[in-house]
């Protein structure tokens, strides 16, 4: 459950940061800010994608270890 809670917490933090990026984007009018916003959004999406992949990998390893199909044989 700790891993699940951590994933939910980080996902919430990322979604709130993207939301605040939207606020800043509408606050300032200019191409420079739009470019920064686009780059920020892309890097955030890459982070989310990487985190989801890592989360599912850890989840799969955990399930494998519990059922003894995969993972470390200790």
From Swiss-Prot:
One GO cellular component term noted in the UniProt record for this chain: membrane
Keyword Transmembrane helix: yes
Chief place of localization: membrane
Transmembrane segments: 52-72
Keyword tags: Membrane, Transmembrane, Transmembrane helix
Localization: Membrane
Lipid bilayer topology: Single-pass membrane protein
Protein's name in the database: Uncharacterized protein MJ1386
Species this chain originates from: Methanocaldococcus jannaschii (strain ATCC 43067 / DSM 2661 / JAL-1 / JCM 10045 / NBRC 100440) (Methanococcus jannaschii)
